[in-house]
């Protein structure tokens, strides 16, 4: 089964994806790639330009509710305080090559990746992609805040992230 129709696939841009080393543990990020669909890095998940909090600590902007489909595929969801929130993968390596950084149920960026391994299907995938906005396939849906309120759409093209944390920067604790 395909996630996208042929016309939708043609309306997705290829993206040069930089696979930098983990900014806290210097674990090699591997080769850069050109991809149509990918997952965010630590730097991207902590980028205010993308709407996220700069700190790697708890953040509402990184919380993500699992869909029924994700749960049926094995993704674990919090059943208590953060109801239906789940962990999601980042592409940055963790403290060593066997771990991958991830975001936990309360939006904390877990840069070590400890506690989950590469084959752990309890962690969900939250894909990122770039759309050709000139395509007639896509329609702007507006914005919806975390409280469910819709706002008047403001189309603003995104630019390359201008924030790249280094191990020397103080941007919060690392777990």
Model-predicted segments: where are they?
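Collagenous Gly-X-Y triple-helix signature in extracellular proteins
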Residues: 1-175
């Amino acid at each position: 089964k395909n996630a996208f129709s042929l016309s939708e696939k043609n309306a997705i841009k290829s993206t040069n994806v930089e696979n930098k080393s983990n900014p806290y543990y210097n674990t090699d990020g591997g080769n850069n790639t050109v991809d149509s669909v990918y997952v965010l890095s630590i730097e991207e998940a902590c980028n205010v330009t993308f709407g996220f909090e700069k700190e790697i600590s708890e953040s509402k902007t990184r919380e993500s509710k699992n869909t029924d489909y994700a749960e049926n595929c094995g993704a674990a969801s919090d059943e208590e305080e953060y109801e239906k929130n789940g962990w999601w993968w980042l592409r940055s390596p963790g403290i060593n090559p066997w771990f991958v950084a991830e975001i936990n149920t309360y939006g904390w960026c877990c840069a070590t990746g400890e506690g989950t391994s590469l084959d752990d299907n309890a962690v969900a995938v939250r894909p990122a992609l770039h759309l050709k906005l000139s395509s007639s396939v896509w329609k702007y849906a507006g914005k919806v805040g975390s409280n469910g309120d819709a706002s008047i759409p403001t189309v603003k093209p995104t630019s390359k992230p201008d924030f790249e944390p280094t191990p020397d920067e103080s941007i919060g604790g690392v777990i």
